[in-house]
């Protein structure tokens, strides 16, 4: 049977794939395969062209898609940490800056909070009656 609450994550690749055209392609492919059209957008990675600041542009675009009536986008992912940026792992671990990623560059907690509050405000009217779609209708 599988997970009735499954979703696809669009994270980009060589090019971003969070835009309206690519979301529609994903919806069509899922529908054609008989899979529920639940899509999550990764605002980082290929969709931000690995520039952590561009995550906010992706998030704004996704908010617009939802506000304009898209019902298949069920969530977003952001790369976030207490402080922005990233750092290499130093030989002397006491030099690690707390709250700064040691992998991909992240937006700061302050930027994250501001962005998510704006995102919620932007989509509030469009999401008040939405439910997560599942294979079994629950």
Task: Give, region by region, the residue ranges found by the protein language model.
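Expand to "…catalyze enediolate/carbanion chemistry for C-C bond making/breaking, isomerization
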Residues: 1-137
């Amino acid at each position: 049977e599988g997970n009735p609450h499954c979703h696809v994550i669009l994270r980009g690749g060589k090019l971003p794939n969070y835009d309206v055209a690519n979301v529609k392609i994903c919806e069509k492919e899922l529908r054609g395969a008989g899979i529920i059209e639940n899509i999550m957008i990764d605002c980082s990675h290929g969709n931000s062209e690995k520039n952590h600041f561009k995550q906010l542009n992706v998030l704004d675009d996704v908010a617009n898609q939802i506000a304009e009536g898209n019902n298949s986008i069920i969530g977003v992912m952001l790369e976030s940490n207490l402080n922005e940026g990233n750092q290499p792992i130093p030989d002397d671990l006491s030099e690690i800056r707390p709250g700064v990623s040691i992998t991909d560059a992240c937006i700061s907690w302050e930027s994250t909070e501001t962005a998510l509050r704006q995102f919620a405000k932007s989509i509030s009217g469009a999401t008040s009656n939405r439910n997560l779609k599942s294979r079994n209708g629950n």
